[in-house]
């Protein structure tokens, strides 16, 4: 498709150019003795200058002509060269081609040196039958298609053949996993080569090749290149790569060396179509390969060195080149060509004077200059072989093109052109020998459809893998790409056995060492085990925001109880319980902690803590342990949720009777008695703040045994109130104190309990508890020997109360029972009042909602919408109510409707009909829901309607005795849906077209008549035949429904007694005689009515709709 478009564009362009050329003057000159051959050259000046630039390649053209004449060719021809710098641009190529053919009338076109541009030139040449010779980056496979390009000849094999040669090479060396890298360029030469090679690898006819990575790298982008090489290192060891210039080739070798990819595992195979292999085309006079006559790639491109020679040379030993046969027979002339090619382009007949030609590097020949030489040489050989005296023969493309099928020794080796006008694909695999000379290791020749290989060595190891230790690398290393799968060595395999053997030798020494260590460690272990009994790791203590005071609610049992005794309750002392203790979590339980300054713990202290852990008494707060691995010592004890005794007494918001005080004092005395009998001998820090109270109102002594620990904060002087006088005078430590000091502290605590005030306030107590007071006075005697012991205190207290009252909790429960009995009568009184109010609320609720719905709502249940197959809906409206209301004051209007609807409500209750709502003079009722009643609903509604009419005839307005009240009633039967809508002020609503139609019956009815739909009339006659007197009204246009036949109900048959004349007055004759104006039908809408409250705007209101309809009717009538 693309080629067809190009041909069309070329045809249009050539037609225009032919028309334009007809007006040019005739410049034809008489033929000379020698035939002048005009050669059009489409060159590139600034595109890939180092490879195909005219400044470094163009000199090959005159030098090829000179070489042809040396060998006796083209003696009868002169040459004229027309050079156009198309820069591989397709538009420029078309222009240049037309000028070559039409204006300059060239005999042959050389170039352009790019694949896509060459295709355009070939299409143009085919149209004008001109031969085209290709060189440069023209190895694309499709250029070898002689059918598409019959006049195109190239001296380069196509890259598809290179892919077959690469596939054959992988088969020879048993490789199947490869990576493919190539340098980026604008003309995408290497990209095309790699695509063709990849296509051959994926061809089913070739052995399977796994391409693990294919990536593009950049000459000056080291960051991207680093990422690519890191990926290659982890996935492949056989790497195909492609470059366009010698600079890129040398850059690649430097990069693999810097990335440590030149080890014995890596094989780098360069794919080339330039006949250069390991060489570079320079004229610096540096050493050359004897095989190709080119300078080795590791030599710098300057006259000096660049310090990379050694690195590149080492990297080249891991490199192979798969290239077109590059062995040049005449290496001297190749050297001459390299030295003089830049001079030749500037000299006649080229005479290139552009900036590029004048400033070109004179040391490096263009990469594809030798191909340009061979192209010109091929054309000269073809001209000579034509050997015709007829000048017109040389213009006949069908004669000259077959002469291109020939062979000769060129500057790119032996050139053999096949019948498809491309060079015969003869590839060679080049490597370096031990002398760093380029040698051919294998030759690949394609004989359709097989790629044959001829090895140039007998022994592979030394010839091919000399630099690899004579061993062929694997495409997958034995140890894997990351070195994690290496086989286990002998030492690694038997390491455990060797270690065991060595261990046996030194076992005796180890046993001796262990024996000594065991004695030491056992001692330390025993010490650690002992310490672990009382040590609490600080990490196991978690702070809690909850404070002891938050447990005040736990004391509600006594705080809420009535007062049992009278006394002072104005204690204002604030407890320091929360200041002394902190609540924390330890092993998922709340505990109390107290901080002490860090100090040295003696062995006696540690032994004391172990024994304290074992203390167990109901009036001793259990010591859990001590944390010593933080900045402070933290003592951990069991939590008493009611706080300290001082904290309870300081609040003073409940009363304590004699027995309550007795039990608390007794618990303190029992705790002291237990401590005085233990190894501790005494408490030493007894005060009301260290007497803790648990949930059962049981007192437990805390902060005992902390003799040598100093509190974190300086204790307030207030604590000295509980210290015995002899301790204050002598500044005694706990270890120097006697148990009598605790007795003194006990007396102070007892006085606090008795007075519910601070210490030393016992004289203000007015209750009669002389025995306890006498005991307290004995305990705070000045002389320690006069104070009773803790055991004596307990024995004396046993006789202060009767044996029946020994438990404080029983006493508390008795107090609560007395309080409960006083509440029962009050509760019974309140219950009666609540029952009465509940009945009133139920009555009010039943008037607002159906009973079943109300019961579900009271139970907290949701009321799901319910569908009813058959119900009868009733609508009524007071006729001319607006006129009546205008004659009444607002209060008279309300009284009028109240009198009327109160009697209507009585009639409704008599007929089992549910009243949904009434708004203004509108009235809505329904029968058949929420309790289904079969088909009795039509009878109930009709009977109720007749009763309404009967009542209205006798109803008189007190303040308007001459005015009568008339109703207009509409009835319809059918299905509907009912449900509760809303949460605040819920409403029982009806939904369905049945409701709307009933409203239309009312609004289209007549005063004092009952208007029925055909459905309601059929239901009435079907189930209650001969019960009611009805008549057809005829067909009426109903808003939103169209034409409907409706009916009148005049009364029950047994009740009708009016004369026929009255019937004829009330019964309309036909619809045609009625002047009834009907508004247009409304749009479909959701219709619903509710049982209570005002309607939201989103819910359809039949009452409002039929009232609006009535007002619209009046407006039209006026």
Swiss-Prot record:
Domain of life: Eukaryota
Enzyme class label: lyase
Protein kinase domain mapped to chain residues: 558-875
Membrane-topology descriptor: Single-pass type I membrane protein
Keywords, ordered alphabetically: Cell membrane, cGMP biosynthesis, Glycoprotein, GTP-binding, Lyase, Membrane, Nucleotide-binding, Receptor, Signal, Transmembrane, Transmembrane helix
TM region(s), chain numbering: 495-515
Tissue expression summary: Expressed bilaterally in AWA and ASI sensory neurons and in RIA and PVT interneurons.
Annotated region (Disordered), positions in chain: 1076-1103
Domain notes: The protein kinase domain is predicted to be catalytically inactive.
Task performed by this protein: Guanylate cyclase involved in the production of the second messenger cGMP.
Protein name, UniProt field: Receptor-type guanylate cyclase gcy-2
Organism annotation: Caenorhabditis elegans
Lineage: Eukaryota, Metazoa, Ecdysozoa, Nematoda, Chromadorea
Gene: gcy-2
